[in-house]
Regions:
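Conserved beta-strand hairpin/beta-sheet module of binuclear metal-dependent hydrolase folds
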Residues: 1-50, 83-85, 144-147, 154, ...
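General small-molecule cofactor/ligand-binding pocket signal
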Residues: 6, 89, 113-118, 131-133, ...
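Active-site-proximal loop/helix segment associated with metal-binding centers of metalloenzymes
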Residues: 15-17, 126-214, 220-222
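Active-site neighborhood of phospho(di)ester-bond hydrolases with catalytic His/Asp-centered motifs
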Residues: 35-38, 54-62, 91, 200-205, ...
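Active-site metal-binding motif and surrounding structural segment of the metallo-beta-lactamase
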Residues: 39-89, 113-116
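Metal-dependent catalytic neighborhoods of phosphoester/phosphodiester hydrolases
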Residues: 69-77, 101, 268-277
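Active-site neighborhood of divalent metal-dependent phosphoester bond hydrolases
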Residues: 79-116, 266
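Binuclear metal-ion centers of metallo-dependent hydrolases, dominated by the metallo-beta-lactamase
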Residues: 119-120, 208-331, 337, 341, ...
Length: 359
């Protein structure tokens, strides 16, 4: 089953010409989960993958850069005649916030469920769960989130099953689903249970133990990196993280890929990536519209697919939506580059990008 993270916005606190405010779209099979919804998120989605029918929205905390795009998106869903229910999850205080928004989005033709989570609450889904993680940030309540898949059955040994008298074909499938076939039990012919995939999204946070524990052996840790280490004192005062701190947490948690986001407008992104890679080499600094694809562990590591005008055109032709320009189509101090890429001249677009495997 496909699992990916699409980054609709990677800026920190305020948008820039090439970065939108925080929003991460997680796609797992047919499920669509949005984590945070900063101002302009729906337009970022329209410019890229389209305004999808979301299943759920998870808000990390109530600083405006993480939720201000939500009332407009709810209204747009109404104007598009959405009929499917939508659930919004968030920390304590979410009901009060949504009540205040109601004057903006008005009456909706679809059911809107508001669920306040307590620290360490879990939201069960089909084949996985989403867990709230209490993090350290200057907000009344702030969460990160972990998406954790259910364990998967081990591999079937077809030769052993056949020797025990099981006929190849549908009966093999029954064994894999946990059924006993002709007296043969699944545990007789199935290998060890395999772990599912894990994604962790920090939201805004200073380094904290709860996040490190939740991120243990995660396939992808999406961690904020608002500052470089030169601004460590400012990070401490505002309860944000430096790129080095994010990398130290990733190394301690033994994650497979660290993805840096929530980038201050003072940085291009490359300096954050380089600072983190000095501690934890498997690090990427994200740009708007990047996608991380997460295969099952036995099929390899997560890979980063950079957005490009070529990808935008191809997806627009396939989906019938207007093509969107790459968000970093011009040079400047806010335009990050892949490792080793030369800086683009003013007005020069980055070359079309192919999927890049993490180190």
């Amino acid at each position: 089953m496909d699992l990916s993270l699409f980054f609709a916005g990677t800026a920190g606190s305020v948008p820039s010409a090439r970065r939108g405010l925080p929003a991460v779209l997680v796609r797992r099979g047919g499920d669509r989960l949005l984590f945070d919804c900063g101002e302009g998120t729906q337009r970022q989605l329209l410019r890229s993958v389209g305004l999808l029918d979301l299943d759920s929205v998870f808000i990390t905390h109530f600083h405006a850069d993480h939720w201000l795009g939500l009332p407009g998106m709810l209204k747009s869903f109404a104007l598009r005649e959405r009929s499917e229910p939508l659930t919004v999850y968030g920390p304590p205080g979410l009901h009060e916030l949504m009540d205040a928004m109601r004057i903006i989005y008005g009456r909706l033709p679809y059911e809107l469920d508001i669920v306040e989570l307590a620290p360490t609450d879990t939201v069960p889904r089909d084949g996985y769960l989403v867990a709230a993680i209490p993090v350290r940030h200057k907000a009344n309540a702030a969460f990160g989130y972990a998406l954790v898949e259910d364990p998967r059955p081990g591999h079937l040994d077809p030769q052993l099953a056949a020797r025990l008298g099981v006929t190849p074909g549908p009966d093999f499938g029954r064994l894999q689903r946990g059924e006993t076939v002709d007296g043969v039990k699944p545990e007789q012919v199935m290998g060890p249970t395999r772990e599912g995939r894990k994604l962790v999204i920090s939201g805004d946070s200073a380094p904290c133990e709860a996040l490190a524990i939740a991120a243990h052996e995660a396939d992808v840790l999406v961690h904020e990196a608002t500052f470089t280490h030169e601004e460590a004192e400012r990070a401490r005062l505002t309860q944000h993280s430096t790129a080095r701190q994010a990398a130290e947490l990733a190394r301690a948690a033994d994650v497979r890929l660290l993805a840096l986001t929530h980038v201050s407008s003072r940085y291009a992104g490359g300096e954050l990536r380089d600072e983190a890679r000095a501690v934890f080499p498997a690090t990427e600094a994200l740009r708007d519209f990047d996608t991380i694809h997460v295969p099952f562990p036995e099929r390899g590591r997560a890979t980063l697919e950079r957005w490009s005008e070529r990808l935008s055109r191809e997806r627009a032709q396939a989906g019938g939506q207007d093509a969107a320009p790459a968000p970093d189509a011009s040079g400047g101090r806010d335009t990050p580059r892949a490792a080793g890429d030369p800086a683009p001249r003013s007005g020069e677009a980055h070359p079309a990008a192919e999927p890049v495997a993490s180190p």
